[in-house]
Amino acid sequence: MSRRDFIELAQRVATLKGKVSEEDRKAFAEELACFLALRNPHFIRVRFIAACGF
């Protein structure tokens, strides 16, 4: 999965959940891209799960 795929997935999930504002959604996508670039998959999973409300 590419960096762009992760960003799009995060945006779709956040939007579908309806719990995240547009500003927060964009900030999360940016953070996700940064951590993906640093290749820290554990942190990405934790942050993604937290953002999705699971």
Where are these predicted regions, by residue range?
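Catalytic phosphate/metal-binding cores of nucleic-acid and nucleotide-processing enzymes, i.e., regions
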Residues: M1-F54
